[in-house]
Amino acid sequence: MFLLYEYDLFWAFLIISSLIPILAFFISGVLAPISKGPEKLSTYESGIEPMGDAWLQFRIRYYMFALVFVVFDVETVFLYPWAMSFDVLGVSVFIEAFIFVLILIGGLVYAWRKGALEWS
């Protein structure tokens, strides 16, 4: 039998943790002074008067490097618990981690061959 009352603590935590940021944004929006002027509309650059246009276009290469970094950063997050529990879980976990690493290496080779890692 599936008992829903066992999840009451979870739902209470979910509701409270959702309401706190919503209330914080609402209260700051109500209590914050609203003053619009040329100083508020200008770009802030370390207290120095801005020179030129504040809009700057980034090259797509930065995005590709960031994406590859995030993929391998997440890989590290997944591999660390596997490495710490290897002696308890055994060979099956090693095989799963090996397959996971092979898939990521395949993705890295694909990105390399497509030229995503070339800096030109």
Curated annotation (Swiss-Prot):
<keyword id="KW-0874">Quinone</keyword>
<dbReference type="InterPro" id="IPR038430">
    <property type="entry name" value="NDAH_ubi_oxred_su3_sf"/>
</dbReference>
<comment type="subunit">
    <text>NDH is composed of at least 16 different subunits, 5 of which are encoded in the nucleus.</text>
</comment>
<dbReference type="InterPro" id="IPR000440">
    <property type="entry name" value="NADH_UbQ/plastoQ_OxRdtase_su3"/>
</dbReference>
<keyword id="KW-0520">NAD</keyword>
<keyword id="KW-0150">Chloroplast</keyword>
<comment type="function">
    <text>NDH shuttles electrons from NAD(P)H:plastoquinone, via FMN and iron-sulfur (Fe-S) centers, to quinones in the photosynthetic chain and possibly in a chloroplast respiratory chain. The immediate electron acceptor for the enzyme in this species is believed to be plastoquinone. Couples the redox reaction to proton translocation, and thus conserves the redox energy in a proton gradient.</text>
</comment>
<dbReference type="GO" id="GO:0048038">
    <property type="term" value="F:quinone binding"/>
</dbReference>
<keyword id="KW-0812">Transmembrane</keyword>
<keyword id="KW-0813">Transport</keyword>
<dbReference type="GO" id="GO:0009535">
    <property type="term" value="C:chloroplast thylakoid membrane"/>
</dbReference>
<protein>
    <recommendedName>
        <fullName>NAD(P)H-quinone oxidoreductase subunit 3, chloroplastic</fullName>
        <ecNumber>7.1.1.-</ecNumber>
    </recommendedName>
</protein>
<dbReference type="GO" id="GO:0008137">
    <property type="term" value="F:NADH dehydrogenase (ubiquinone) activity"/>
</dbReference>
<keyword id="KW-0618">Plastoquinone</keyword>
<keyword id="KW-0521">NADP</keyword>
<dbReference type="GO" id="GO:0019684">
    <property type="term" value="P:photosynthesis, light reaction"/>
</dbReference>
<keyword id="KW-0472">Membrane</keyword>
<dbReference type="GO" id="GO:0030964">
    <property type="term" value="C:NADH dehydrogenase complex"/>
</dbReference>
<dbReference type="Pfam" id="PF00507">
    <property type="entry name" value="Oxidored_q4"/>
</dbReference>
<feature type="transmembrane region" description="Helical">
    <location>
        <begin position="88"/>
        <end position="108"/>
    </location>
</feature>
<keyword id="KW-0793">Thylakoid</keyword>
<keyword id="KW-1133">Transmembrane helix</keyword>
<feature type="transmembrane region" description="Helical">
    <location>
        <begin position="64"/>
        <end position="84"/>
    </location>
</feature>
<keyword id="KW-1278">Translocase</keyword>
<feature type="transmembrane region" description="Helical">
    <location>
        <begin position="10"/>
        <end position="30"/>
    </location>
</feature>
<keyword id="KW-0934">Plastid</keyword>
<comment type="similarity">
    <text>Belongs to the complex I subunit 3 family.</text>
</comment>
<dbReference type="InterPro" id="IPR023043">
    <property type="entry name" value="NAD(P)H_OxRDtase_bac/plastid"/>
</dbReference>
